[in-house]
């Protein structure tokens, strides 16, 4: 069986990047939660 994680920076940024998070209301909620928790890194 092949390894299922085949990294791609482009796909990672498009799916989980800061701009992707900011694009939707729920994404903004994700960022707000991570800020509230005190995460050093908010998004990919």
From Swiss-Prot:
PROSITE patterns per record: RIBOSOMAL_L34 (PS00784)
Ribonucleoprotein found in the keyword field: yes
Keywords: Ribonucleoprotein, Ribosomal protein
GO biological process, one term: translation
Pfam families: Ribosomal_L34 (PF00468)
InterPro entries in the record: Ribosomal_bL34, Ribosomal_bL34_CS
Domain of life: Bacteria
GO CC annotations, alphabetized: ribonucleoprotein complex; ribosome
GO molecular function: structural constituent of ribosome
Entry keyword annotation includes Ribosomal protein: yes
Family: Belongs to the bacterial ribosomal protein bL34 family.
Entry protein name: Large ribosomal subunit protein bL34
Gene from which the chain derives: rpmH
